[in-house]
Amino acid sequence: MRRCEVNSKPISEYFGIPCENREMAKCLLTSSLSVRTKLLQTGVSLYNTSHGFHEEEVKKILEQFPGGSIDLLKKQNGIGILTLNNPNKMNAFSGVMMLQLLERVIELENWTEGKGLIIHGAKNTFCSGSDLNAVKALSTPESGVALSMFMQNTLTRFMRLPLISVALVQGWAMGGGAELTTACDFRLMTEESVIRFVHKEMGIVPSWGGTSRLVEIIGSRQALKVLSGTLKLDSKEALNIGLTDEVLQPSDETTALEQAQEWLEKFVSGPPQVIRGLKKSVCSARELYIEEALQNERDVLETLWGGPANLEAIAKKGKHTK
């Protein structure tokens, strides 16, 4: 039985199976790409029952662990402020907070006027990971995997939001808090802040998608150092390895948030549909094969070409404005 080729590659490289003809190979490859493209669409869950994931059952367990809140402020300038609010426990995620984070992500997916998002922790601390009360109750491998799938789904949808996102790290970002920073497009740290992946000391590995995202940000070699060494990454070291984008001057909580907004504003200036289109294009370029990413680029362009922002820019000859 001969092997079919798509784009000069044996189809077995994609699926590990031989096929009878070129058309079948193309069909299989197209179906696989279509699935990934659908997952990139706003509002689509990463897992379902076919993966052994029962979301409602996980939610019933998580709602038994109250404490803290995830607060969202949507500003008129198109920048949202997401606050992890559980200061008595260094903003650790309770079960209810995990549920609320998904709710806020869904709300942001439907915020058509949104352009940017800043996530930070209350009282000058970012997040210390998971509340141990919830962790102790989820002691079996099955429950651990279920929680992992829930948070992987939430943070992947967070990462794919059509908003340019920034993690403002003050104080400590540990464990799950460190993983959360990697779901943002950018990271800003105050001078005294520290990011630390403490998972090895807890006898586990990152389980909220943090490993994949960390490798994407700083490369596999540096990621292995950070994870296996449980390194305490202060702002200087995080900047040196490319984990953070800028270090803010010493300031209180309010001033740091103002600085973060000022930093973000230069990236989100312009019409929402253009900023959102740019973010969608970057997401597809990162996660899809080149052919499908190019198709997505054309799809986004079709919604913008000849639109109000495009016509106004042409009228002002904005393309050549310095």
From Swiss-Prot:
<keyword id="KW-0456">Lyase</keyword>
<dbReference type="InterPro" id="IPR029045">
    <property type="entry name" value="ClpP/crotonase-like_dom_sf"/>
</dbReference>
<keyword id="KW-0963">Cytoplasm</keyword>
<dbReference type="GO" id="GO:0016831">
    <property type="term" value="F:carboxy-lyase activity"/>
</dbReference>
<feature type="modified residue" description="N6-succinyllysine; alternate">
    <location>
        <position position="232"/>
    </location>
</feature>
<dbReference type="InterPro" id="IPR018376">
    <property type="entry name" value="Enoyl-CoA_hyd/isom_CS"/>
</dbReference>
<dbReference type="GO" id="GO:0004492">
    <property type="term" value="F:methyl/ethyl malonyl-CoA decarboxylase activity"/>
</dbReference>
<feature type="modified residue" description="N6-succinyllysine">
    <location>
        <position position="316"/>
    </location>
</feature>
<protein>
    <recommendedName>
        <fullName>Ethylmalonyl-CoA decarboxylase</fullName>
        <ecNumber>4.1.1.94</ecNumber>
    </recommendedName>
</protein>
<dbReference type="GO" id="GO:0005829">
    <property type="term" value="C:cytosol"/>
</dbReference>
<dbReference type="InterPro" id="IPR001753">
    <property type="entry name" value="Enoyl-CoA_hydra/iso"/>
</dbReference>
<keyword id="KW-0007">Acetylation</keyword>
<feature type="modified residue" description="N6-acetyllysine; alternate">
    <location>
        <position position="232"/>
    </location>
</feature>
<dbReference type="Pfam" id="PF00378">
    <property type="entry name" value="ECH_1"/>
</dbReference>
<comment type="function">
    <text>Decarboxylates ethylmalonyl-CoA, a potentially toxic metabolite, to form butyryl-CoA, suggesting it might be involved in metabolite proofreading. Acts preferentially on (S)-ethylmalonyl-CoA but also has some activity on the (R)-isomer. Also has methylmalonyl-CoA decarboxylase activity at lower level.</text>
</comment>
<comment type="similarity">
    <text>Belongs to the enoyl-CoA hydratase/isomerase family.</text>
</comment>
